From Swiss-Prot:
It comes from Lodderomyces elongisporus (strain ATCC 11503 / CBS 2605 / JCM 1781 / NBRC 1676 / NRRL YB-4239). Signal peptide: none annotated. Disulfide bonds: none annotated. Its EC number is 3.1.3.84, 3.2.2.-. This is ADP-ribose 1''-phosphate phosphatase. The gene is POA1.
Length: 160
């Protein structure tokens, strides 16, 4: 497991030949990509946004789970969008961190059979500093979850 920090735009990450990439973000369970990085996902991937919203409205008990969607431009980008259900806006930062751990463990299982890019022998998940915006979780708390996951490596994109 490695957490690597990259200065730049998450959406410029490109797939190695023959592989797909994962762009992950923390999501609410209400079906709204309305603010923060989620709003950027909604503008960039309106079809995936509709799929996410429909999924949320048809399902319950989503906290601690993940939803993997193909990006609208999957044929070109080979990008999957990982929706990590970490909050419904009623959780403490500690609860959000717990749900982050659970959702990433589920994501790791979902990715096992897919041709996802690797580094250091692990599949890679690309993300911003999840939970640290609207959900208000100190980044160090989420980072601790990433550090202990043995099955995935993380590229965390930061913008100055």
């Amino acid at each position: 497991m490695t957490v690597k920090y990259i200065r730049g735009d998450l959406f410029t990450h490109s797939a190695p030949t023959g592989k797909s990439i994962v762009l992950a973000h923390a999501c609410n369970t209400g079906g709204s990509w309305g603010g923060g990085i989620a709003a950027v996902f909604a503008r960039k991937y309106p079809k995936a946004n509709r799929q996410y919203s429909e999924y949320c409205h048809k399902n319950s008990h989503l906290l601690g789970t993940s939803l993997l969607l193909k990006a609208d431009d999957y044929d070109k980008s080979k990008a999957y969008i990982a929706c990590l259900f970490t909050s419904d806006f009623n959780q403490s930062p500690e609860q959000i961190v717990k749900y982050t751990d659970q959702s990433l463990q589920e994501l790791a299982k979902q990715l096992k059979s897919l041709p996802i890019e690797t580094q250091n022998g692990n599949q890679v998940v690309n993300m911003p500093k999840i939970n640290s915006g609207i959900f208000g979780v100190p980044w160090e708390n989420t980072e601790a979850v990433l550090d202990k996951l043995d099955s995935l490596d993380f590229n965390v994109y930061v913008i100055d």
